[in-house]
Amino acid sequence: MAPMGIRLSPLGVAVFFLLGLGVLYHLYSGFLAGRFSLFGLGSEPAAGEAEVASDGGTVDLREMLAVAVLAAERGGDEVRRVRESNVLHEKSKGKTREGADDKMTSGDVLSNRKMFYLLKTAFPNVQINTEEHVDASDKEVIVWNRKIPEDILKEIAAPKEVPAESVTVWIDPLDATQEYTEDLRKYVTTMVCVAVNGKPVLGVIHKPFSEYTAWAMVDGGSNVKARSSYNEKTPKIIVSRSHAGMVKQVALQTFGNQTSIIPAGGAGYKVLALLDVPDMTQEKADLYIHVTYIKKWDICAGNAILKALGGHMTTLNGEEISYTGSDGIEGGLLASIRMNHQALVRKLPDLEKSGH
């Protein structure tokens, strides 16, 4: 008896043919995707969207700069609002190494909440270090509209993608808290810095009370520039108010009696003093020197801005500062721009010793 045959209708043939094509397309496209991934190729992400990968993905530094500027300004709004209300809820977190009160206010806390959650919502896969404690129960969802401001697009025309796991963000929600409590408003800043593999690559310093914002990206662009000239022989040196006398003694020995010392609050303010800043409240200096322990969120943004403009910020021994690991540095710091930085380091051999 002859075997029974299987007969398909024309519709069934068409269905099987289409299913076969679908399977082949799926296998072939998966093969191509794997090859493209192997060689680092693939389609470009849509404008304003960072590419996502299984290992945490990448982030666009241009987008991070846009969010950092927004975060610094939003935090600054809180800082200004609290100060103008004159209800600071001031308290001490403990003592600094020099024995002074390490103060905190509502301005610090509310600014920190705005800045941290804006950055964390926009870039959930990056590490964020901030000066103030983040209370998970007090979470605030702030959504970025994914628009990059025109001034940033003008300076940085193309996206700059880096692995998210290589990024560390440093936030200072209120720099110069001591001066803030004394109502010395010109010294107060909010700051955001992005470091890649420990190197500072973009920085934002915002002055809430004059509403001025400086930003810069290394190998990218900036909205601030260096001044046309600096006095290297008898420089004006800006230092912390708490140890101005200590630095003055050594500076006079090093540079002579014509050297002047500018006592000031806030690391952000001191870095801006080295630049061409269109703010009438901003003092001008040629060098920034710090001789005691300092936290990285105080200096990372300024370091990135100086580096982007061709300047330098190192320890007093001339060592580059890494923005990974611990949250502070022991070796003091020297910041300069358009000067022979290493020659200055050699002139200041005793400052670190005198600061401890």
Curated annotation (Swiss-Prot):
Positions of AMP binding: S240, H243, G266, K270
CDD domains in UniProt: IPPase (cd01640)
Cytoplasmic side: 1-12
Localization per Swiss-Prot or TrEMBL: Golgi apparatus; Golgi apparatus, trans-Golgi network membrane
Class of enzymatic activity (EC top level): hydrolase
Pfam families membership: Inositol_P
PTM statement from Swiss-Prot or TrEMBL: N-glycosylated. Contains N-linked glycan resistant to endoglycosydase H.
PROSITE patterns, per database record: IMP_2
Pathway assigned in UniProt: Sulfur metabolism
Glycosylation sites: N257
Membrane topology: Single-pass type II membrane protein
Keyword Lipid metabolism attached: no
Protein name: Golgi-resident adenosine 3',5'-bisphosphate 3'-phosphatase
Gene name of this polypeptide: Bpnt2
